[in-house]
Amino acid sequence: MVTATVLGHWQWGHLQVWQLPHTAGTRGEPQARQVLAPVLGLAPEQLPISRSERGRPQLGRPLEGQDVGWSHSGGHLLVALGQGVRLGVDLERIQPRPRMAEVIARFFHPDEVAWLLGLEEAARQQWFFRVWCAKEALLKAHGHGISFGLHRFAFAPQGQCLQVSVSDPELGPAGSWQLREWAIGADFRAALAWQPL
């Protein structure tokens, strides 16, 4: 039996995220089931978790109004649960990216390219990981992952926060997306993106 040792917990209204230790090379779903089961009132093996054709986790009857997701990186696992939303969660390790400017220029939306490449290197690195993590979380919520295209929508800073500024029609209006992001220690960024059902 897998046990869930919770290292952190965050909540925003009907959305919750748990942080757990995670062994590299193992699946996150068994631990996700352990942490979700007591909250959802079912045994871990009874949780109706299935995968969409693109691999996105989803809850079935009788929990259709809830949504789940998880992400792992560098010994950490985040498990997210929300009610009345479609959500995505991402966790990224902050590490040097020698070709960061090339990645931005090649894959990001033109507005993000202009903004990020106009920053000093230290600021660019900080914002790059925040934007990357936010983009992954949003695309996990959407259900297509990064194959959808990182260039098809944009985040922009609003003070010290990020918000969707440009949205491809397939993603819905930019204003329909919400984002929470935070640091986990000095080496990781986390993001939770969601859209109301």
Residue ranges of model-derived segments:
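Core catalytic alpha/beta fold that binds nucleotide/phospho-ligands
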Residues: 1-197
